[in-house]
Amino acid sequence: MNIAVSTTAEGLSMRPQVQWRVRWESELCLADHVELSEFFRKSYGPTGAFNAQPFENNRSWAGARPEVRVIGYDARGIAAHIGLLRRFIKVGEVDLLVGELGLYAVRPDLEGLGITHSMRVMYPVLHELGVPFGFGTVRPALEKHITRMLGRQGLARLLSGIRVRSTHPDVYLNLPTTRSDDALVLVLPIVRSIGEWPTGTVIDRNGPEL
């Protein structure tokens, strides 16, 4: 499944022309993974060498592996990326099917140009998959950015005061098997309304973060 969307259609003159494609994981070839791995190392590297480390050896995912990706391309190659994985999480005592969003990155030279608004191309993918909700976690520093990108259009809501528990992607002898984070929870109502999101102050992924 491929979708190409030109960002110039949204009328923002500062925004570079980017073509968006929706790619299932099994559609990616070795060259795609090599290119994505380099893109993630360059995108996550400025935030700390530790954050770029998972993408060594041509690996194009950090924790859980996505099943579908939205990838933006421009004349210089990969410009932006977001991944999606359908999974069951536990919100309080309720098991819930969600489409988890993660592996979000924008090429460093494009930061601040508004390109991240085009990540909304993932929204119709969530509808096509028929999941009740889209779900993700974001750092508090990105609250204003996410609100501007999705919240004001009524596409999503940010929830605070929730602890999210995940497993590590690998087993480490010097670490517990799980970790817990106090992060903002991003909820996108898709098939069900935001009022149907279960109450609960703890979310368990029962797996690694995407």
Curated annotation (Swiss-Prot):
Predominant localisation class: cytoplasm
Q: Name one Pfam family in it.
A: NodA
InterPro entries the UniProt entry points to: NodA (IPR003484), Nodulation_prot_NodA_CS (IPR020567)
GO CC annotations, alphabetized:
cytosol
User: What keywords appear on the UniProt entry?
Assistant: Acyltransferase, Cytoplasm, Nodulation, Transferase
Q: Does the keyword Secreted apply?
A: no
Q: Return the PROSITE patterns for the record.
A: NODA
GO molecular function annotation: acyltransferase activity
| This protein's record includes keyword Thylakoid | no
Q: Which Gene3D superfamilies match?
A: 3.40.630.30
Q: What class of enzyme is it?
A: transferase
Location in the cell: Cytoplasm
Protein's job: N-acyltransferase required for nodulation. Acts in the production of a small, heat-stable compound (Nod) that stimulates mitosis in various plant protoplasts.
Enumerate the HAMAP family for this protein.
NodA (MF_00084)
Give the record's family classification.
Answer: Belongs to the NodA family.
Q: What protein does this entry describe?
A: Nodulation protein A
Which species does this protein come from?
Answer: Bradyrhizobium sp. (strain NC92)
